[in-house]
A protein has these predicted regions:
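Conserved catalytic-core motifs of eukaryotic protein kinase domains, centered on the activation segment
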Residues: 113-115, 181
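Gly/Ala-rich beta-loop-alpha elbow adjacent to hydrolase catalytic centers
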Residues: 145-150, 154
Length: 294
């Protein structure tokens, strides 16, 4: 099969490519860290225990909801995803609606946190943060917004301490960890497929070798959900946006969040992978915290 190539079109495409490359180089050259800051919504620290910090956001509108909302993200990422940038921010949207908003920051676990369990995070740190919000609001119960792994934390907490939870909202939260086992598209539930491909001893060796579950490893596993994008985003994907400053900064902010995935404390990671992903104990009613069924 012959392909006709118009030299004039080739020259035009090459000139356009060169122009975009030059514009992209200029934009990258002038971009500074302050231009790609994330989680910039004003807030103040109101409570701290070990590395866990509770923040309260500054109100921007008249309060329309009497019950404050505590946002709880997981340990496999950072809460900053909920406040990525001014025009793409769950936090700013909730504040604009008059919600009294708090967020939990789990900090950056190190090898010194290797022995922390899910009980430590749910029954101690999360419980302490909820207690602080209750004290500040003068209420006995508050609303919880759980995101990803944080949704499992809040779900377990609500099941064990229902008197402290007025409303529970979950988003992108796994409950049936084997829901993808049959009939789901290949890219759905990849973390579950990966974790179930490991033996219990594999997980033990992984944690013992590293102390924690490495954030870099989880970033790689997540990237396998969209392998083509993972291979092309730094060439084709970046090229598509590099001459548009707004799109380029959006791209860089997302990459900044993706590359800042903290390690997951070792013992808590064992529970997360074994009890939940491998054995699906939560939906079976077999999951235990502190020796008690959730």
């Amino acid at each position: 099969m012959r392909v006709k190539v118009d030299p004039r079109e080739v020259a035009k495409e090459f000139a356009d490519f060169s122009r975009r490359m030059q514009k992209g180089r200029e934009l990258l050259d002038k971009t500074r860290d302050r231009d790609v800051q994330i989680a910039t919504t004003p807030k103040r620290e109101v409570f701290r225990r070990d590395k866990t910090v509770l923040y309260r956001y500054e109100p921007v509108a008249k309060k329309t909801v009497s019950v404050p909302v505590l946002v709880v993200y997981g340990l496999v990422g950072r809460y900053t995803m909920a406040d990525l940038q001014e025009d793409r921010s769950l936090i700013r949207n909730l504040l604009a609606q008059g919600v009294d908003l708090y967020v939990v920051d789990w900090g950056t676990p190190t090898r010194g946190d290797r022995w922390l369990t899910l009980e430590d995070y749910i029954d101690d740190y999360l419980d302490a943060c909820i207690g602080q919000v209750c004290r500040e609001s003068g209420l006995d119960a508050i609303s919880l917004l759980g995101i990803c792994e944080g949704g499992v934390f809040t779900l377990c907490y609500a099941a064990r301490r229902p008197e402290r939870v007025k409303n529970l909202v979950l988003t992108i939260t796994p409950v049936d960890f084997h829901a993808n086992a049959k009939g789901a598209p290949p890219h759905h539930g990849l973390i579950g497929l990966w974790s179930r491909s490991l033996t219990s001893e594999d997980i033990d060796r992984l944690i013992e070798a590293n102390g924690n579950l490495p954030g870099e490893l989880m970033s790689f596993v997540f990237s396998l959900m969209t392998p083509v994008n993972a291979l092309t985003k730094y060439n084709l994907g970046l090229f598509d946006v590099m001459d548009d400053e707004k799109k380029l900064l959006n791209f860089l902010r997302m990459e900044k969040w993706l590359q800042d995935r903290p390690d997951h404390p070792g013992e808590a990671a064992k529970q997360w992978l074994k009890d939940l992903y491998q054995e699906n104990q939560l939906v079976k009613g077999e999951f235990r915290l502190g020796g008690e069924k959730v």
